[in-house]
């Protein structure tokens, strides 16, 4: 059911969203031009804001904030502004309170995307000080730089599971590394595989790995370029097994995707939320639609 059951008006533009479950309640984390908003959405029809963290940089120039959580802490980055910071917030006591435990630009100022491999306590900061920087979170409130990657112009986004990092490298395609040996500065990851030539190859923007690790859904951020499903069961022989789109407009752009079970959730720039059944990855079918322009 794609009926809208709750909403919240705010006098600024929203950008990124994230979600956490804490103390038997569910929370939505949403970025805006002013900072980070945390909503209790346990009952989505009566959601309400429980906390707000002002950004280090605010105003209409803020287009990108990004989030990930680990060990009861929320990690916040922003891709705009010379006064931006890395913010770490203790959210373990939600909905009652939060506590900003770190707010500084010592490690990074701007950063486009952040992803945490929770199984290995490593934070991947995309397009920050280098193409991508990796930090140890052995102490969650004191990240320690353990690796900087400059093998490409920049890494736009990353998906990491158990030290296997799927890196979206813009016009330089997809690269997959193993970071299990990277624990301190000087250590080097192992390149497992890469894909630079494929149908509708453009600006390799984002992707998500299936629960079983066999499939990878990938989006190139170009007008009219299809979503791709990749067979990554053998990273030495990555293959595109299907391509598809929303069917709305030949110039539409698929932005970000998340896989949950057999469903692929795609946010489009103009076509809203689209959900595809990928139980047959060779023949995905569109099953749910929500028009965010309504």
Residue spans of the language-model regions?
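Feature marking well-ordered beta-strand scaffolds used for ligand recognition
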Residues: 1-294
């Amino acid at each position: 059911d794609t009926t809208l059951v709750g909403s919240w008006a705010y006098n600024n533009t929203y950008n990124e969203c994230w979600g956490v479950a804490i103390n038997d309640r569910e929370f939505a984390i949403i970025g805006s031009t002013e900072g980070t908003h945390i909503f209790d959405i346990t009952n989505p029809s009566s959601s309400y804001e429980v906390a707000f963290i002002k950004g280090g940089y605010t105003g209409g120039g803020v287009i990108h904030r990004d989030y990930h959580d680990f060990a009861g802490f929320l990690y916040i980055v922003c891709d705009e502004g010379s006064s931006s910071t890395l913010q770490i917030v203790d959210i373990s006591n939600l909905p009652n309170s939060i506590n900003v435990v770190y707010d500084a630009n010592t490690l990074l100022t701007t950063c486009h995307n952040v992803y945490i491999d929770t199984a290995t306590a490593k934070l991947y900061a995309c397009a920050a000080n280098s193409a991508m920087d990796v930090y140890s979170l052995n102490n969650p409130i004191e990240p320690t730089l353990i690796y900087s990657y400059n093998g490409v112009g920049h890494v736009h986004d990353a998906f990491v599971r158990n030290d296997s990092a799927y890196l979206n490298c813009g016009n330089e395609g997809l690269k997959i590394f193993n970071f299990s040996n990277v624990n301190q500065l000087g250590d080097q990851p192992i390149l497992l595989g890469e894909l630079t030539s494929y149908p509708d190859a453009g600006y390799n923007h984002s992707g998500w790995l299936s629960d079983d690790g066999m499939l990878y859904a990938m989006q190139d951020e170009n007008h009219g370029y299809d979503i791709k499903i990749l067979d990554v069961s053998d990273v030495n022989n990555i293959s595109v097994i299907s391509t598809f789109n929303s069917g709305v407009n030949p110039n539409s752009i698929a932005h970000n995707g998340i896989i949950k079970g057999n469903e692929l959730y795609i946010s489009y720039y103009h076509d809203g939320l689209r959900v595809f059944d990928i139980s047959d990855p060779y023949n995905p079918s569109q099953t749910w639609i929500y028009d965010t322009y309504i």
